[in-house]
């Protein structure tokens, strides 16, 4: 009973709630990077909740109202950066409650020869809608 009151008062789970929530909420982040590296926009779109918000390095805000607006132009990323793949370097849960989790995400980008050319810190907000976790918003210093 006391633990339940602590959760209600603080919004932070105690005991076994945090690890299970963390792994469930992290799953769409892992799936996003798998889809991104596979250059699979359909799979990538399924990891997101809509409207989806992305804030880029220049402070520009993209809002995708639904999956038809979402996606990544992989050809442009390859042309502009020489991108071949990305790695998910660390994912740290910073805040959470039953419907929203904030993650600090660090990822790197690599060229085809395996050279890492960029590492970015970012904030990802993952939400639970109708029992399904999805990435609702991302803010990073990546272009």
Question: Residue ranges of each PLM-predicted region?
Answer:
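A solvent-exposed, acidic/Ser-Thr-rich amphipathic alpha-helical stretch
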Residues: 41-91
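Hydrophobic/aromatic beta-strand elements that line small-molecule binding cavities or substrate pockets
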Residues: 88-94, 107-109, 121-127
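Generic short beta-strand segments
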Residues: 51-53, 104-110
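A short hydrophobic beta-strand element
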Residues: 85, 99-107
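Short, low-complexity N-terminal intrinsically disordered segments enriched in polar/charged residues
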Residues: 8-46, 50, 67-68
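Short beta-strand edge/turn micro-motifs at domain boundaries
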Residues: 117-143
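A short, structured loop/turn motif at beta-sheet edges
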Residues: 93-101, 126-133
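Short, cysteine-centered beta-strand-loop-beta hairpins and adjacent loop/turn segments enriched
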Residues: 109-117
């Amino acid at each position: 009973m006391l633990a339940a009151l602590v959760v209600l008062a603080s919004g932070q789970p105690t005991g076994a709630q945090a690890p299970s929530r963390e792994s469930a909420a992290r799953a769409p982040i892992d799936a996003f990077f798998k889809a991104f590296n596979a250059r699979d926009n359909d799979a990538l779109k399924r990891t997101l909740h809509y409207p989806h918000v992305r804030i880029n390095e220049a402070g520009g805000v993209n809002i995708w109202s639904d999956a038809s607006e979402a996606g990544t132009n992989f050809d442009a990323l390859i042309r502009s950066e020489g991108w071949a793949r990305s790695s998910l370097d660390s994912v740290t849960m910073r805040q959470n409650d039953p419907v929203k989790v904030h993650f600090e995400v660090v990822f790197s980008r690599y060229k085809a020869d395996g050279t890492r050319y960029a590492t970015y810190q970012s904030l990802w907000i993952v939400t639970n809608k109708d029992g399904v976790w999805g990435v609702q918003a991302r803010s990073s210093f990546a272009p």
